[in-house]
Amino acid sequence: AFELTQTPASVEAAVGGTVTINCQASESISNWLAWYQQKPGQPXKLLIYKASTLASGVSSRFKGSGSGTQFTLTISDLECADAATYYCQSTD
């Protein structure tokens, strides 16, 4: 069965720092991957689609990269407001 594996499970970082979240697909999905941000009590927010395309209104501090089976979300210049759950999702 198709699976997406995200690492690390959790991360701590300082304001102004950078974090990287990885997503590995069990089979190639080309660039059909999206990244979402989820905060408690709020709907999920689309950050990145097609692996690297920034969604409308999303800060350029968020960067998506990768293709095939390996993908990365990088958040730079961290702000307190970035505290959230982030997840990847296949859009194929």
Curated annotation (Swiss-Prot):
Alphabetical GO biological process terms: adaptive immune response
Location of the region described as Complementarity-determining-1 in the Swiss-Prot/TrEMBL record: 24-34
Cross-referenced SUPFAM superfamilies: Immunoglobulin (SSF48726)
Transmembrane segments annotated in the record for this chain: none
InterPro entries hit by this protein: Ig-like_dom (IPR007110), Ig-like_dom_sf (IPR036179), Ig-like_fold (IPR013783), Ig_V-set (IPR013106), IgV_Light_Chain (IPR050150)
Region (Framework-1): 1-23
Region of interest (Complementarity-determining-3), residue spans: 89-92
Gene Ontology cellular component terms for the protein in this record: immunoglobulin complex
Keywords: Adaptive immunity, Immunity, Immunoglobulin
Stretches for region Framework-3: 57-88
SMART domains referenced in this protein's UniProt entry, alphabetically: IGv (SM00406)
Complementarity-determining-2: annotated span: 50-56
Region (Framework-2): 35-49
Extra remark beyond the main annotation: This chain was obtained from antibody to type III pneumococci and was isolated from the serum of a single rabbit.
Protein name listed in UniProt: Ig kappa chain V region 3381
